[in-house]
Amino acid sequence: IDGKQVKSYREEDRVAKDSVTPTFVSGKLTIDNFRWAGVPFYIRTGKRMKSKTIQVVVEFKEVPMNLYYETDNLLDSNLLVINIQPNEGISLHLNAKKNIQGIDTEPVQLSYAMSAQDKMNTVDAYENLLFDCLKGDATNFTHWEELKSTWKFVDAIQDQWTMVEPCFPNYEAGTNGPLESCLLYTSPSPRDS
């Protein structure tokens, strides 16, 4: 990680080789309501992964009448990628028609990221929170009802896990987690790079 050789969790001193302490989770979540029906949400987080990044990837559905559907080329998904950490920015990944005769396409990326000058003048997230705290502004803080709902969700998952003998696949430090977690993602996109 960052050019250094590091141990995975189970290789650490004072950690049992058969430890089942949760250090990684990957999942496909769905929300059972009208607005989000049929929209999968994928999450992946863990210790000692390839990189520390936080991003939201919106993968657009294919339209039924796609002009470029019947080509020999396998088209990439159209994506909106919102990078939250470490490099704030946004990019739109599209299949664009090549500027030639025919219907061939090529992947293009439209990106925006803050300039180095803007980054230098931007306060850290914690600075904003501390300032809000001093002002008594609770807008950006988690309220009890939100926290309670979050724990209700997490507790339901934890309860299911305790009912089954754990068989967690291990993973090497500096990777994106176990191979099994990558199988959740059904199409190639920047999120797996």
What are the functions of these language-model segments?
Residues I1-S187:
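Secretory/organelle targeting and membrane-embedding segments
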Residues P188-S193:
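A short, hydrophobic C-terminal helix/tail in secreted or cell-surface proteins
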